[in-house]
Amino acid sequence: MKRILHSQVIPLEDVPLEDSQRTDGSRGLDVLVVDDELIIADTLAMILSRSGYRAGAAYDGSSAMQLARLHRPGLVITDVVMPGMTGIELALALETTVPECKVLLFSGQATTIDLLWKAREMGRDFTILSKPIHPADMIRRVSEYIQPAMHDSYATVN
């Protein structure tokens, strides 16, 4: 049975594992959205969910890493500038933890350029989208990375 959770924050340990804790390497989530602005993370995850993706949201890099290990998303969309772990630090950590996961960065801050140059100096090149982004443009960009699973599921986790 699929559960639909709309904009409800639930503790990480309460996330249902029926579809996500898999030993065969299959994904529990298609897309994980990470942003310290809850309304942005929740809204993007909801838009993706309504477009057929199994989408979840996290509000910081640490929670995102836990969810990525558990749910093995095909794509993580992360804000670049966040307290604690930046989106670029998250992307680099995901390379070793969940290597099959692709990362798409998005930001509305000019300081992002400095972070991207630092990443490029380390030999990493990331795709970045500007905030705000029209929902149709986000769906189009996500579809370039991953196809929807066509399941109704959505969870926000902090």
Predicted region positions:
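Conserved phosphotransfer cores of two-component systems
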Residues: 69-71, 94-101, 121-123
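Short hydrophobic/Thr-rich beta-strand motif most characteristic of the beta2 strand and flanking loop
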Residues: 52-59, 67, 129
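Alpha4 helix (beta4-alpha4-beta5 surface) of REC/receiver domains from two-component response regulators
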Residues: 89, 102, 110-130, 136-144
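Charged docking surfaces used in two-component/phosphorelay signaling
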Residues: 42-50
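Receiver (REC) domain active-site loop signature in two-component systems and cognate sites
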Residues: 82
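Acidic catalytic/metal-coordinating carboxylates
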Residues: 59-63, 86-90
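Non-catalytic signal-transmission and effector/linker regions of two-component phosphorelay proteins
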Residues: 1-30, 134-158
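Active-site residues of response regulator receiver
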Residues: 79, 107
